[in-house]
Amino acid sequence: MIKVKLVRSRIGCNPNQRRTLDALGLRKIRQEKTFEDNAVVRGMIAKVVHLVEVTE
């Protein structure tokens, strides 16, 4: 399981990064979600790695 926490603001991000955060379900700063560890989620995290904090 992977825990993903939004730590930086979405303001100023490009639209693709915003859609990725929406798909991850991260809308507010300090919001956390837990996901299964798979390639799809890893790829989404890689797109917004500068905005999130990941713990395994």
Curated annotation (Swiss-Prot):
GO terms for cellular component: large ribosomal subunit. Keywords: Ribonucleoprotein, Ribosomal protein. InterPro entries: Ribo_uL30_ferredoxin-like_sf (IPR036919), Ribosomal_uL30_bac-type (IPR005996), Ribosomal_uL30_ferredoxin-like (IPR016082). GO terms for molecular function: structural constituent of ribosome. The keyword Ribosomal protein applies. It comes from the Bacteria. One of its GO terms (biological process) is translation. CDD domains: Ribosomal_L30. Belongs to the universal ribosomal protein uL30 family. Part of the 50S ribosomal subunit. This is Large ribosomal subunit protein uL30. The gene is rpmD.
